[in-house]
Design a protein with these regions (language model features):
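Hydrophobic alpha-helical transmembrane bundles of multi-pass membrane proteins
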Residues: 1-214
């Protein structure tokens, strides 16, 4: 049984806080105050907007309704995807990159749910899958021109990051699982960690246990 988020308005607020912060995140990477910053601002905003719109329409087509949470993930997917190429692509390319990210995130979330990966907020799809897409897009849409060598280097970077992250994360999580334990019990998960770990329930009217007792 899925455990849904308790507040769509708070999720929307969090998305817009991240969206605003991303302007500083991407523009700061130039390490200098020059005209490139304006282009980075534009590309960042366009990619996020395109990601949100395409994720909304994709989820609408797939599920019959334009899901709010998937739309938020689409905006974040666009932001993640444009991070690598933010200073080296045109505004039109930024729209294309963000739009593709919005479509990717929907199908990626569906895929990881189908193979039973516990990712309640779609972090793998937003940051992992679309991080890889953005890295590849930096080579494909480069304003200075692209080549097989450039794309090959980008793919090598993607594979290197995946191998390093997978191996180190697997070792870390395995050690945690063998010592203090990696997951809580199904009962604690259903009841809510606010209660099981802190002795209080932040949202007593929205927990599974509140309805089970009625």
């Amino acid at each position: 049984m899925p455990i849904l988020g308790h507040s769509i308005p708070l999720a929307a607020l969090g998305t817009f806080i991240l969206w605003l912060g991303w302007f500083g995140f991407n523009a700061r990477s130039t390490t200098a105050a020059n005209k490139d910053i304006a282009m980075i601002f534009v590309n960042t905003n366009l990619a996020a907007a395109a990601g949100a719109v395409l994720a909304m329409f994709t989820s609408w087509t797939k599920f019959g309704k334009p899901g709010a949470s998937m739309t938020f993930n689409g905006a974040l997917a666009g932001l993640v995807a444009i991070t690598s190429p933010c200073a080296t692509v045109s505004p039109l390319s930024a729209v294309i990159i963000g739009a593709i990210a919005g479509v990717i995130v929907v199908f990626s979330v569906i895929f990881f749910d189908r193979i039973r990966v516990d990712d309640p907020v779609g972090a793998i799809s937003v940051h992992g899958v679309n991080g890889a897409w953005g890295t590849l897009a930096a080579g494909i849409f480069n304003m200075g021109g692209t080549s097989a060598k450039i794309i090959g280097v980008q793919i090598l970077g993607i594979v290197s990051c995946f191998v390093w992250t997978f191996v180190t994360a697997f070792i870390m999580f395995k050690l945690i699982d063998m010592t203090i334990g990696l997951r809580v019990s199904p009962e604690e998960e259903a009841e809510g960690l606010d209660f099981s770990e802190h002795g209080g329930n932040a949202y007593p009217d929205f927990g599974v246990s509140a309805y089970a007792q009625q």
